């Protein structure tokens, strides 16, 4: 089942905003631990999921599919961000 356009637009907006949040992060000393950063990023993902979940439209299965796609996209962005953070920690 394809996502309805409203949900596609909402997911796209959320992904852009999340990416902006990640790109605004400045790594500096003293750095927090990798585990702490993972916790922070997981909290951000949960915040975005909960915020956008309330705005999804359509039948429940359409909302669930949109939410699953959104979560996958946020997790992909998070993994890339955390890789950059790990590299920062190694170079410090």
Curated annotation (Swiss-Prot):
One of its GO terms (cellular component) is cytoplasm. It is found in: Cytoplasm. InterPro entries: A_Hb_stabilising_prot (IPR015317), AHSP_sf (IPR036468). The keyword Transmembrane helix does not apply. Acts as a chaperone to prevent the harmful aggregation of alpha-hemoglobin during normal erythroid cell development. Specifically protects free alpha-hemoglobin from precipitation. Monomer. Forms a heterodimer with free alpha-hemoglobin. Does not bind beta-hemoglobin nor alpha(2)beta(2) hemoglobin A. Belongs to the AHSP family. This is Alpha-hemoglobin-stabilizing protein. It comes from Bos taurus (Bovine).
């Amino acid at each position: 089942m394809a996502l309805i356009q409203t949900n596609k637009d909402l997911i796209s907006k959320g992904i852009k905003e999340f990416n902006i949040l990640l790109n605004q992060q400045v790594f500096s000393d003293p750095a927090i631990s990798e585990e702490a950063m993972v916790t922070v990023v997981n909290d951000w993902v949960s915040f975005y999921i909960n915020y956008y979940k309330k705005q999804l439209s359509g039948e429940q299965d359409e909302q669930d599919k949109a939410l699953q796609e959104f979560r996958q996209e946020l997790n992909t962005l998070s993994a890339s961000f955390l890789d950059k953070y790990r590299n920062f920690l190694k170079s410090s």
